[in-house]
A protein has these predicted regions:
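A recurrent flexible, glycine/aromatic-enriched loop bordering the glycosyltransferase active site
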Residues: 24-72
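Generic serine detector
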Residues: 2, 30, 37-40, 48, ...
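Short secondary-structure transition/capping segments
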Residues: 16-17, 45-54, 135-139
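Conserved donor NDP-sugar-binding/catalytic core segment of glycosyltransferases
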Residues: 1-37
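C-terminal catalytic/acceptor-binding lobe
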Residues: 58-75, 79-140
């Protein structure tokens, strides 16, 4: 948590779910896409503190996509197509996790939970060539 003192209010815009999570269509460049910046640095930690989210009072919030830390309902992931597009991608690509998430969110919805207890890992990417994003080259 080397970013815990790096407060970035401009990246902490959040929309809470009021009621059940619902399907949404999210595309690169849309207003909803901007939600992804919430998962940089220690933003989720700061947001949890600001909104007084606790394990006894968790909050569901709208997401675009979440890097690294995510859980799927396996049945819903498969119903949305899962990662069946894998063979259509070139060997050097990125964004397959984003592609799968966008498909699940469009069919079933998706949310983040505060407090998450999971924070930015600060590891360097193992994908050096990130020129091909799956969600940009394949049909969503």
């Amino acid at each position: 948590l080397s970013y815990k003192d790096d407060v970035r209010p401009q990246q902490q815009k959040v929309e809470l779910w009021d009621g059940p999570v619902k399907p949404e269509t999210i595309r690169p460049g849309s207003v909803q896409w901007e939600r992804a910046s919430l998962h940089s640095a220690a933003n989720v930690l700061h947001l949890s503190d600001r909104l007084n989210a606790t394990p006894d009072h968790p909050l569901k919030y709208k997401i675009a996509w979440i890097g690294a830390c995510k859980l799927y309902d396996t049945k819903k992931l498969r119903e949305a197509g899962g990662f069946n597009f894998w063979r259509e991608l070139p060997p050097e690509h990125s964004g397959e996790d984003v592609m799968a998430q966008l498909k699940v969110i469009e069919k079933f919805g998706g949310c983040g939970i505060l407090p998450s207890g999971a924070y930015h890992q600060e590891f360097e990417t193992k994908v050096p060539n990130r020129d091909v994003d799956a969600f940009r080259v394949l049909d969503l």
